[in-house]
Amino acid sequence: MQRVHQLEPGDVQRLIDAALAEAHVDEAQVSLAVVDGGGHLLGFHRRPGASTASAEAAIAKARMAALTGQDTAAMESAINGERPALLQLATVLGQPAAAMGGGLSLRFADGLVGGIGVSGMTPQRDAAIAAAGAAALPIWPHLEAVSFSCGDAEACAAFFCCQLGFRRLDAIDPGPDYAALVGLPGAQLKLVRLALGQEHLELLEVRELAPGQRPGRPFPSDARSNDLWFQHICIVVRDLNQASAGVREGIASGTIAPISSAPQRLPDWNTAAAGIEAFKFHTPEGHSLELLAFPTGKGDARWHEKSEPGVFLGIDHSAIGISDSNRSCRFYDELLGLRLGGDGVNHGPEQDGLDGLAGTQVRITGHRCPSGAGIECLDYRSPSGGRPMPSDLKAQDRAHGQIRLLVGDHAEQLEELAAQVESYGGQVLSPGVITLPAAAASQLGFRAGLQIADPDGHRLQLVVR
């Protein structure tokens, strides 16, 4: 069963507080209302000096936005333009039309969860106050970063920056609590943090192991795309031929190992993926990467914005090898709150060439966050022989990848997830929820974390701010 998102009391108060903070800037005499997806009132506030009429109008605006899924300013423009019949909605919905600025629909994970209405000032000012409130809507789950374990994080960072357009942010010692979170208590770690577009990549290097901890292992030399430890990041590019030029030179010189036989264009019969161009390869340390160019009409709208500079645009998703699509859908969508963003089977010579396999049939399910990067699950039906995740995989091993997901704003949410992980086929790896000291929390961008494994062993770091 898909998770149905709804506004919680804490969400409602957060929206109202944010709107009130904006109204306080000019002491706006307004009323504020928040309703659920059915138009039922969840929260209300009337500022000093706000009229009785503003109270009724704020509720009407919120209800209209929620029940129609449209912002009331857009409805006003439509009614004044080519669609005056929209006024009949007032009769259909049994409430005032409220076709004036100040009512905004509230969406979460592409679903309508309610509306916020503000009234008492000009329509433009009402709309600005409502927008400040709507901006406080929680944005989780959100993929905060992907992490790869490296033997030499600085050398890996140089590769990503020189070859793939990443920018270096910083290098930090994440501290002992973070080391305990990733399963290496007492070890000395280094995190080199990179960014591409809106997304972040962390390169983890173990500088010194604690007594009794074994050395890290390299990738198996015979690793294949259908092994269950497989994980790549998909880097969206504007032009695949231009973006892959340096990589192809590295392959020719022997410094980079290919996965794909050559850049591939997915066939027209595959409606969901037709026209996508992609190329997979390994970094010098063995991590798997994909360069991908979306044709017009596919992928997030941001990948087609002309204002985005450069050839390398950002990270669309991290793909992971799995053994049971239905089980992984339950884990990622029901438990963690992502949404199913695509489901299909790729096969044929183009997929063989892309994955470096023969006779490929792979079911691909995409799992998306409300915004930003997502997770893609690769369930290879053919060829057989994909090997499971090593049961003793540790953070010092090159095959150790990690996806950090922001899942809330208080530690109790992590406790609730920890209690459910095993029932969805996963495993809690950290010694419970680990709360970071203030300095580490400020440096890392989260204040508490829980380390888990999905049903196939892929590492996830669930965090709250």
Regions found by a protein language model. Give the residues of each.
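Core segments of cupin and vicinal oxygen chelate
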Residues: 149-200, 271-274, 321-374
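Exposed loop/turn and edge beta-strand positions of beta-sandwich/beta-sheet ligand-binding modules
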Residues: 100, 188, 229, 275, ...
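Vicinal oxygen chelate
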Residues: 138-139, 148, 171, 200-202, ...
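An N-terminus-focused feature that recognizes amino-terminal "leader" regions
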Residues: 140-163, 167-237, 241-253, 423
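Short beta->alpha transition motifs characteristic of CBS
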Residues: 44-49, 116-122, 291-297, 381, ...
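Short, solvent-exposed beta-strand edge segments and adjacent coil->beta transition regions
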Residues: 113, 141-145, 228-232, 315-317, ...
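Flexible internal linker/loop segments at domain or repeat junctions
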Residues: 358-359, 375-397
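Flexible, solvent-exposed loop/hinge segments and secondary-structure transition points
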Residues: 1-138
